[in-house]
């Protein structure tokens, strides 16, 4: 049963209080998106702030060697979150029958699609129809899924998991509940309650769906291939590419402004081998599933 809006709002307040610590923390959290876009005037201030904040809260901190520019050249927190990565640190395997990780992060769940549903380790069940509105979900029956959580120190760009074509991106309005695993509860199925953008691809291995789920503090989800696609938070909207947009594995397709979670759903095939397990750290371009062939 879907919780009421009142229950969702109460849960949002409870989560925010728990993670940010009282009314002051709630106020800072509410201003988080604006603060993340606030320019930091001094290069020295940026370096000290970024290293201190991320090093203490998310050890071992930021991997500066792989960033696409020096740390002091990111003028805002949002610019740091949405940074690129030097390509030599993300080699993309060419021509392999595999679906690759679409992002950096930590694997939360890996499993099978059964009876049109996915079941997470926290025993929260999601139907593909609710996760991917308007998609022919029957094509994924018996397939696999992976859920990757992006922490604040991860690169917040999202990439194509296989060669193929991008057909559409659908913005689904919703809430902004926390997606961090300790805060997930069965009464509030965040992947279908929260605002999200669902992408539909075709690939040589079959259809593929990728869902970017917004969480607490996410400012926006942007698409390099459609910079004008900025639907309102409460608006269901679809961007369709006709003809479909060719994409290469490892090609940048979208960005979280701040961060959240990506759900990847891949098609059924005999002898598909999952290559990762829950709690594994992954980088974009790293193989998640190998297909026979």
Roles of regions detected by a PLM:
Residues 1-293:
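Contiguous, well-folded functional domains in the mature portion of proteins
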